[in-house]
Every structure is written in structure tokens, then in C-alpha cells.
Amino acid sequence: MEPSATPGPQMGVPTGVGDPSLVPPDYEEEFLSYLWRDYLYPKQYEWVLIAAYVAVFLVALVGNTLVCLAVWRNHHMRTVTNYFIVNLSLADVLVTAICLPASLLVDITESWLFGHALCKVIPYLQAVSVSVAVLTLSFIALDRWYAIYHPLLFKSTARRARGSILGIWAVSPAVMVPQAAVMECSSVLPELANRTRLFSVCDERWADDLYPKIYHSCFFIVTYLAPLGLMAMAYFQIFRKLWGRQIPGTTSALVRNWKRPSDQLEDQGQGPGAEPPPRARAFLAEVKQMRARRKTAKMLMVVLLVFALCYLPISVLNVLKRVFGMFRQTSDREAVYACFTFSHWLVYANSAANPIIYNFLSGKFREQFKAAFSCCLPGLGPCGSLKAPSPRSSASHKSLSLQSRCSVSKISEHVVLTSVTTVLP
């Protein structure tokens, strides 16, 4: 990923002004006015870009912060998958808060305005966030694959998840050190270097032309092509297992011998309002587990698909530029500039898309988001608490739901029947 690299100064900018000390004041004032009018001041389409960046900035920061708060303040949401989702949100907050504003200014001015130190830091943090995101998504896919295919071989726990997250944050900064080492800030117009930071670029400097080809080829394979290929295979197997047949551990004999709760109660001489027998309750629990796993798998597949689509343009453009040497001499410079600018925006749009995906595909996250917004915005209902309900209130709610289920046994019977059609092939 290369959001901070600049394609170069725009056409029409003077290529030299001689000795800066000999420039007449009236010429300098005219030249600065020209820079503001024709170079710095955003054009119409750039105002659209600014609005798009601002929207992504707000949605990404607010949405990912709410994701972290929802898991932190609710013990029932502290699952292994949600730990990894929080880690992904932290990486998104990092890249949005630190790197997005710099990328916006670079795309608008086509100049690096932040000096030599940040020229190394900001691209480095962007590369680290990419590595963290890819490794986190890979660990999620691996965890889900083991949970579906080998539930007894590997027991996933919160402690192991936290250890994996620490490992991700230890490995990612280490492997991305070369990105910081090769970044250098230089001026396209050296005669203006002491007077303005305009026309400065933050780009890679390699000792040999072969090195960037090797580095960016490996970067593309390790951070995009290989992990996405492995994750696609894992989710394909998960999809086939969950939607094609019963998950491991489902009791086929229980399904074959299952009788409706009302029939079992009548055989035992009990009324229709009695509690369902253990066998029916076990079957309902398996149906509930199946549905929960399907919902989680569907949400994670969408997250992976959106990540792949958002990072595809910048990954391909970087390979074409760094490995094959394209875009150095081009007649349609504006089209190249537009492609790079849009691909930069897509990278940050992925950070804003994840909380939206959680909202639409996860009922628990949706409840927490609604509770948070109801505290801040009027008209959204009573202000709910982000905390999990107390055990007493949960027990009371469970008792009421049991009474309601007993009083409407026919409805419960219909729910179980529809559940059977979901599980049976």
C-alpha cells in the first residue's frame, strides 16, 4: 500500500525560478498567488474527494470506537471472534486517525508537507496496519475453520486469542521496518526547498532497481495474494459444511427419533403447558448453535470480501508501478492520478465499512450501536445501557419467556418444526 507517495508535481508549475535571493518581491507575490489559485486551491472534483474523506474519517472513527466499547463493556460479547474484531478495529482507528489526514493533503496538493521524520513514520504505520489487518483476518478464518471441522482437536480460548493478538502486534512492526528505511523526502524544485514545502515528495529510495521489484513482489504475495487465497479456501469449506450438511456433533439419531413437544407430553400424560423434555431442549440448542455459526460465518465472509475488494486496486497499482515500472512516462497523467487517488480512498473506506457490516449482520453489535446512539441523539428511543443486563434481570427475562412459551405451546411447536427444516438436508 502506498497512500503517501506522490505521483509528482502537476503540469504547468514553473520548473525553476533562479536564485531565490534574486527573485523580485512582486514576482514572488505573483508566483505565490499563482500557486494558491492554480495549484493549491481544490478544484471541483477535489471538493468531492474531500467530502468523501471526511465521511470516511467520521464513520471509521465513531464506528470502530463503538465496536471496541461494545466488547469491552459487555462480558457476554467477549468471544474469541470478537477479540479479533476489536483488534481489527484498533488497527482501523490507528490508520484513520494518523494516516488519513496526511493522505488527503497529499492527494490534493501532490506535495509532502510533513517533513522528513513523518515521511518515514506515516507510510510505516500504514504498512503495519495492513499487516495487522491481514493477520487478524487470517487468525479469524483459522479459528472458525478449526471450530467447524476439528472442534475437539483445538480448543480456542480467550487467553489464546489475546496471545495471538500480541503476536500479531509484535510481528507486524518488525516485518515492516524496511518500509520505513527506504522512505525519503526530497524536493522536485530544489531552488524552492528553503522557502516552501510544496513540490516535495515522499517516496522510496533504493540502492538498486532490482530491490524494489523483489520487495514489492513479496509484499503483494505475503500481505494480499497468499493470505486471501488461503482464507477463501477456508471459508469455502466452512460454507460447504454449514450450509451443505449438519455440523460435527449433531445427533442424527435425535433428529430421526425426534417427536414434537406436544406429542411427547401427551405420551407422558402431561398437559401442553409443561416444560419440554431434555431431548427436545437439546435439539433446540443444536439448532440455535447452527444458526449462530451461520450468522457469524456470513458476517466474516462479507468482511473478508470487502477487504479484498478495497485493497485490490492499490495492490495492483503498486505492483505495476514498482515491479513493472509503469506510470513513469504517461500521456494521460490525470487518469493515473485519479486511479491512485481513488485507490487511496478505498483503503480508508474499508475501515469505515467494517462497523457498517457488523451493524447489519450482527444483532448483538446492532443493539449496542443503537443503545449508544440513543444516548446521544434524541428521537431514537430511550437511552439504553451499553452494559450487559444483570444476572437478576436476565433470570427474570428468562422466566417470563418460559411462561410465555408454555402458554402458547402451539407457537413453540411451530418454531421447532421450522427449525427441523433448517437442519435437515
UniProtKB/Swiss-Prot annotation:
Which spans are transmembrane here? 47-67, 83-105, 120-140, 161-182, 214-235, 299-321, 337-360
Keyword Membrane on entry: yes
GO BP annotations, alphabetical order: cellular response to hormone stimulus; feeding behavior; neuropeptide signaling pathway; regulation of cytosolic calcium ion concentration
Where in the cell is the protein located? Answer: Cell membrane
Record's InterPro entries? GPCR_Rhodpsn, GPCR_Rhodpsn_7TM, Orexin_rcpt, OX1R
Q: Which residues lie on this side of the membrane: Extracellular?
A: 1-46, 106-119, 183-213, 322-336
* SMART domains, alphabetized: 7TM_GPCR_Srsx
**Could you say which residues are annotated as the site Important for responses to orexin?**
W36
Give the domain of life. Eukaryota
Bilayer topology reads:
Multi-pass membrane protein
Q: Where is this region: Required for response to orexin-A?
A: 26-41
Q: Which GO terms describe its cellular component?
A: plasma membrane
Q: What is its main location?
A: membrane
Q: Name one GO molecular function term.
A: G protein-coupled receptor activity
Which keywords fit this entry according to its UniProt record?
A: Cell membrane, Disulfide bond, G-protein coupled receptor, Membrane, Receptor, Transducer, Transmembrane, Transmembrane helix
The record's similarity note reads: Belongs to the G-protein coupled receptor 1 family.
Task: Show the domain comment.
Answer: The N-terminal region is required for orexin signaling.
Q: What is the protein's known function?
A: Moderately selective excitatory receptor for orexin-A and, with a lower affinity, for orexin-B neuropeptide. Triggers an increase in cytoplasmic Ca(2+) levels in response to orexin-A binding.
Spell out the protein name for this chain. Orexin/Hypocretin receptor type 1
What gene, per UniProt, encodes this protein?
A: HCRTR1
